[in-house]
Amino acid sequence: MHKSKCIKRVFTFLLALFVFVMAIPATKVSAAGGTDRSATQVVSDMRVGWNIGNSLDSFGQSYNFPYTSLNETYWGNPATTKALIDEVAKAGFNTIRIPVSWGQYTTGSDYQIPDFVMNRVKEVVDYCIVNDMYVILNSHHDINSDYCFYVPNNANKDRSEKYFKSIWTQIAKEFKNYDYHLVFETMNEPRLVGHGEEWWFPRNNPSNDIREAVACINDYNQVALDAIRATGGNNATRCVMVPGYDASIEGCMTDGFKMPNDTASGRLILSVHAYIPYYFALASDTYVTRFDDNLKYDIDSFFNDLNSKFLSRNIPVVVGETSATNRNNTAERVKWADYYWGRAARYSNVAMVLWDNNIYQNNSAGSDGECHMYIDRNSLQWKDPEIISTIMKHVDGTPATINGKEIPSTEQPDPTPVDPDPTPVDPDPTPVDPDPTPVDPDPQPVDPTPVSGALKAEYTINNWGSGYQVLIKVKNDSASRVDGWTLKISKSEVKIDSSWCVNIAEEGGYYVITPMSWNSSLEPSASVDFGIQGSGSIGTSVNISVQ
């Protein structure tokens, strides 16, 4: 063989090999950085996300279980494409939540996930990873009226634990080499399906059924987390999101809910959903189409709640679903987005993820609460770009491209919380009056109530004539930890209609205020914030005794 021919053949082979390698689709799965970022760092970097709703979470009829082909398009949406994810990234979103209903495909008593499902989910995850985006991967409609692969009650606890251990072991193994950009979410809106309190319950006085459900949800979060950690690799320190009952603010604020124990430090994130204000954002029967100042109360209360129990204790929060249904009121939804995301931007450890189900057109009355399309998945055009640009101005100042037009950058907001004394939460998430009387914008600060011992009580009165709120702070000024505390207020001075973050009892002529389990202990210099709300009139000061 002539040397020149040999060289030519070698060159030809190498060229062909090069062309072949270059033809292989590049999928960036970064494991180099591992999962060495804390939950606070990850959530701070996430900031704003978008849901691929009604896609991989779509499910078919239970009589066809187990499905042997994907139901991704079963609810009428097109299959997710990389082009769609590219457009979402261009608009400024850096987080994608991928809801997946795994159970409908599982086989055997050990709930095996078929390869065709896992491969497709991985493909969509990689669409996001190559865009340098965060991904939230969850177990979605595995509890509903058609499928109940888990149920939060003691009667179904054993099989539910088995389900979570199995699917999360499989999912975690498949993605164990992905870096911190992949976040797992144990469950979506776990609840008692069909129960009278499926979607709401009084947080300070839950029924026995709800108490049992909350305890089971705590257990399922722990089982799922343990299964993920046991797979090792990057999963040993991967960030994991966990919800409370129905992922609502009531579900995480009720006294029985707790974050799971974790072998990794600082890797847990609270998952909560908030379509608020409810009458504006989600309601279909009684609803309002205008977002005015009176509706800001629900949003303020929501963040103040989160701050009191989680954010102030260095537990970051992802609002995994939020949106306001399209009631043919784009200008009002722009106001809503401006206030909601502006409020979130005060906290460095909160990320917001917009729900999108690809349904846009409402009826003529605007009464449908499920119209949450922001980008048309067929045309890849944003439907109400002014809403998206309004959201982005509160994120990080990075220019975004929406429908081919670059949106100018804005000054980055200060992520530091500016409201250390939170406005209270209305314990009823479905208020009778959608236009509540606003709180006096100029509240009356009152000097601290002098007390003996280690604790000091401070309060501020918000008085609007027909009602009032008293925001109370109890602080430990001693050098020792205080376990348990009690406050008393005379009934002659206040009439308490509702409260938040505390328990209220009556004793003769006094209201007796005691803490929840999670805020009963105060370290030196620590404090706890809570409040009471009443109707009628109130003076300029009240006498609070601390015991």
Swiss-Prot record:
Keyword Hydrolase attributed: yes
Annotated PROSITE patterns: CBM2 (PS51173), CBM2_A (PS00561), GLYCOSYL_HYDROL_F5 (PS00659)
Superkingdom assignment: Bacteria
Family in the record: Belongs to the glycosyl hydrolase 5 (cellulase A) family.
Keyword Hydrolase attached: yes
Gene Ontology BP terms: cellulose catabolic process
Bias (Pro residues): 414-448
Catalytic activity: Endohydrolysis of (1->4)-beta-D-glucosidic linkages in cellulose, lichenin and cereal beta-D-glucans
One Pfam family from the record: Cellulase
EC number: 3.2.1.4
Protein name: Endoglucanase 1
High-level lineage: Bacteria, Bacillati, Bacillota, Clostridia, Lachnospirales
Region (Disordered): 398-450
The CBM2 domain, residue ranges: 448-547
Key words, A-Z: Carbohydrate metabolism, Cellulose degradation, Glycosidase, Hydrolase, Polysaccharide degradation
GO molecular function annotation: beta-glucosidase activity; cellulase activity; polysaccharide binding
Any one Gene Ontology cellular component term annotated for this protein: cell surface
Annotated active site: 189 (proton donor), 321 (nucleophile)
Organism: Butyrivibrio fibrisolvens
